[in-house]
Amino acid sequence: MDKGKSVKSTEKSVGMPPKTPKTDNNAHVDNEFLILQVNDAVFPIGSYTHSFGLETYIQQKKVTNKESALEYLKANLSSQFLYTEMLSLKLTYESALQQDLKKILGVEEVIMLSTSPMELRLANQKLGNRFIKTLQAMNELDMGEFFNAYAQKTKDPTHATSYGVFAASLGIELKKALRHYLYAQTSNMVINCVKSVPLSQNDGQKILLSLQSPFNQLIEKTLELDESHLCTASVQNDIKAMQHESLYSRLYMS
């Protein structure tokens, strides 16, 4: 038997993933530091201006202390955040590995059509566009041909979908990309709670510490989900996001 054919046959039978479309022009870039940088609160995409409905919960006295803030976070993370943010990140990451631009754009279209609150649709689009433009402004970073093609074609990017394409394009492992994104976005939610409820800084840190086990469960759950679960969202959170549009006073854009 031809050894070359045997090796190729074995690769197909075990379902080996295709090579990550990583560019060789980034030999000077340390992905460990880069993933910290793009998930940092100072990465200029404007995340701090959005609460994604949380401000309504606070003004309606649904979130008033550490306990209710933790309850809100667990509910939000295990519903809307899991089935929209985390799952879309995974789907676009996997599609980027296959260089399937059509599927990525399809995922983004589903999210746009499934997001009822106007403020959330606008927030998703603004954060996604800002994430892409900020990466492109980093001239030392070569994102590769596929990411550049995606950046030109996408009409409704979100932070999660563009981040998924980014991570795949630079060869960042999926589980690591999910872990950093999940922690960073949850940390933003906790900061909003600390500022707006308000909570003490110590309470904020206690909340983050208590979420470590749920974090691991959410990541494992994300890896099990497929496209049929995309945007299985929380109706309650959509309602609060819509109510946010007519709040008398507000600190956040959503």
From Swiss-Prot:
Residues 1-11 have a biased composition (Basic and acidic residues). Residues 1-26 are annotated as: Disordered. Its main location: cytoplasm. InterPro entries: UreF, UreF_sf. GO terms for cellular component: cytoplasm. It comes from the Bacteria. Pfam families: UreF (PF01730). Keywords: Chaperone, Cytoplasm, Nickel insertion, Virulence. Disruption phenotype: Cells do not express urease. It is found in: Cytoplasm. GO terms for biological process: metabolic process. GO terms for molecular function: nickel cation binding. UreH, UreF and UreG form a complex that acts as a GTP-hydrolysis-dependent molecular chaperone, activating the urease apoprotein by helping to assemble the nickel containing metallocenter of UreC. The UreE protein probably delivers the nickel. HAMAP family: UreF (MF_01385). Belongs to the UreF family. Required for maturation of urease via the functional incorporation of the urease nickel metallocenter. This is Urease accessory protein UreF.
